[in-house]
Design a protein with these regions (language model features):
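Long, distal/terminal scaffolding or interaction modules
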Residues: 1-172
C-alpha cells in the first residue's frame, strides 16, 4: 500500500505509477502530474469490484490526470478544479464542491453525488440505473451523452485509462 497522500501536490512532468492500492488523499492538490494506479499482475481481484483508493482523492486538484483500475472511497474529487480522472466507482459525496475538471466513473456512485458541484463535467456509466437516486440535484443537471464530440472525448479518456491501468472494464467500453 502506498499509504496516505500518494502523489500529493505533484507537478507537471512527473508520472507516478503504482501497482497496488493507496490510502486517503491520493493526488491532493494535484498540479499537472499523471498518476496511474493498477492492480499488481499477480492479483486475482476484479478491479471494478474492489476499492483501490481511499477517501478524499484529488482534494483541491488543479490540473493533471489520475487513472485507477478500481473504486475510490468517499469524497472522491472533492474541490477538483481542473484535474482529469477515470476510475471504476466511488462511495458517497463524489465530486462534492467540484468547480472544474473532468471525471469519468465506469461504475456506481454513492449517495449525495455532486453536492455543491458548480463546474466541470462528470460522466457516469449508470449500468444499475441508480444514478438519479444518488445525485444531489440542487446544483447540477444530467443527461445522456448525445453528441459525437462528447462521445469521442469520453471514448478517448476511457482508452487512455485502459492504456494506463490495463483495466479490463475500460477495455469493454472502448
Amino acid at each position: 500500500s502506498a499509504g496516505q497522500s500518494f502523489g500529493a501536490f505533484s507537478s507537471k512532468g512527473l508520472k507516478l505509477v503504482l501497482k497496488g492500492d493507496a490510502n486517503d488523499y491520493v493526488g491532493k492538490g494535484l498540479s499537472g502530474a499523471t498518476i496511474s494506479i493498477r492492480l499488481p499482475e499477480e492479483s486475482n481481484l476484479v478491479s471494478n469490484e474492489n476499492t483501490i483508493l481511499g477517501n478524499t482523492v484529488l482534494y483541491g486538484a488543479t490540473s493533471g490526470k489520475l487513472f485507477a483500475a478500481g473504486q475510490a472511497g468517499e469524497r472522491f474529487s472533492v474541490r477538483n478544479s481542473g484535474a482529469v480522472t477515470v476510475i471504476e466507482g466511488c462511495d458517497s459525496n463524489g465530486c462534492e464542491y467540484m468547480t472544474g475538471g473532468t471525471v469519468v466513473i465506469l461504475g456506481d456512485v454513492g449517495d449525495n453525488f455532486a453536492a455543491g458541484m458548480t463546474g466541470g463535467m462528470a460522466f457516469i456509466y449508470d449500468k444499475s440505473q441508480e444514478f438519479e437516486k444518488k445525485v444531489n440535484p440542487e446544483s447540477v443537471v444530467w443527461q445522456n451523452v448525445e453528441t459525437d464530440y462528447w462521445k469521442e472525448n469520453l471514448k478517448n479518456l476511457i482508452k487512455e485509462h485502459h492504456e494506463e491501468t490495463g483495466s479490463l472494464l475500460s477495455h469493454i467500453h472502448i
